[in-house]
Design a protein with these regions (language model features):
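Substrate-binding/active-site clefts of carbohydrate-active enzymes
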Residues: 1-86
Length: 86
């Protein structure tokens, strides 16, 4: 196909139903819907063997919970990490 890079959705653990990667719940764990950490490493290695770059999208400005139960987020699991609700 001639491409030399792949850009994929965020791979961090998401809240239930967050298939797209933009409802982060735990930034230290991978979304199991996308496979294991080893699967990711293997995929990146296979791409690099073919001179294909892999870019992973990231969400740097929010977590994915829809309520005030901040305890489900890692590492930002306290309300003091967030602005007050508008």
């Amino acid at each position: 196909m001639g491409f030399d890079a792949i850009w994929i959705s965020p791979i961090v653990d998401n809240r239930d139903g967050g298939y797209h990667g933009y409802w982060a719940r735990n930034i230290y764990e991978l979304n199991q819907n996308f496979g294991s950490e080893q699967d990711f490493i293997d995929m990146v290695s296979a791409c690099h063997e073919r001179n294909i770059l892999v870019m992973v999208d990231v969400v740097a400005n929010h977590m994915g919970n829809l309520d005030t139960n901040f305890g489900v987020n890692t590492p930002f699991n306290d309300g003091s990490h967030y602005h007050d609700w508008c």
